[in-house]
């Protein structure tokens, strides 16, 4: 899967080229992009011939400074309502705080996210990038276990831990 980072969401030369590939594309929402702009960027890929597009909500820039970004869970639900595309939620970038990843992951699943993108590293303090917002392996296992009940309550088993 090829990932279009948030800052390249409206790089139309890149999107035009990616539309010609036969590889799945994860389109991250820009930090200041409206949902409509995000969906139109996805449409750019689709109309160029690539039907393998997934949307990724990774938080937006707001006035809040306590978190790296503000995870827009309404955008997850709205994208599901307005589009046929799968929606991925990235609570790592959406919060920038490992302590919030579990609760925001559960909220994203409740909002309709089809998948989660979570930063994990064996030793986050030594990670070359995104270490401050990464989970270590035991933390990741705990988050995954915490998803089992909400997934069952929603009547789905999307990647649910056993």
Which residues fall in each region the model found?
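Glycine-rich phosphate-binding active-site loops on the catalytic face of alpha/beta enzymes
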Residues: 5-10, 108-133
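Surface-exposed amphipathic alpha-helices with a cationic face
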Residues: 19, 42-46, 77-83, 144-152
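Active-site/ligand-binding-proximal alpha/beta "capping" segment
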Residues: 44-111
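Short, well-ordered secondary-structure micro-motifs
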Residues: 14-15, 37-40, 64-69, 98-100, ...
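C-terminal helical cap(s) of enzyme catalytic domains, especially alpha/beta-barrels
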Residues: 123-156
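Catalytic beta/alpha-barrel core
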Residues: 1-12, 24-35, 54-59, 66-67
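Active-site loop-to-helix "anion-binding N-cap" substructures in soluble metabolic enzymes
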Residues: 8-20, 154
């Amino acid at each position: 899967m090829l990932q279009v980072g948030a800052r390249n969401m409206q790089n139309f030369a890149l999107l035009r080229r990616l539309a010609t590939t036969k590889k799945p594309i994860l389109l991250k929402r820009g930090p200041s992009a409206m949902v409509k702009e995000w969906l139109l960027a996805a449409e750019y890929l689709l109309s160029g011939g690539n039907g393998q597009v997934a949307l990724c909500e990774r938080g937006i820039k707001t006035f809040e400074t306590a978190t790296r970004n503000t995870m827009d869970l309404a955008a997850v639900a709205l994208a599901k309502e307005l589009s046929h595309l799968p929606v991925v939620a990235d609570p790592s970038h959406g919060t920038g705080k490992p302590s919030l990843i579990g609760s925001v992951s559960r909220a994203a699943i409740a909002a309709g996210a089809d998948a989660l993108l979570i930063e994990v590293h064996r030793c986050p303090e030594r990670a070359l990038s995104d270490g401050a917002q990464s989970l270590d392996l035991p933390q990741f296992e705990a988050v995954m276990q915490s998803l089992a009940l909400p997934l069952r309550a929603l009547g789905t088993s999307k990647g649910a831990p056993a």
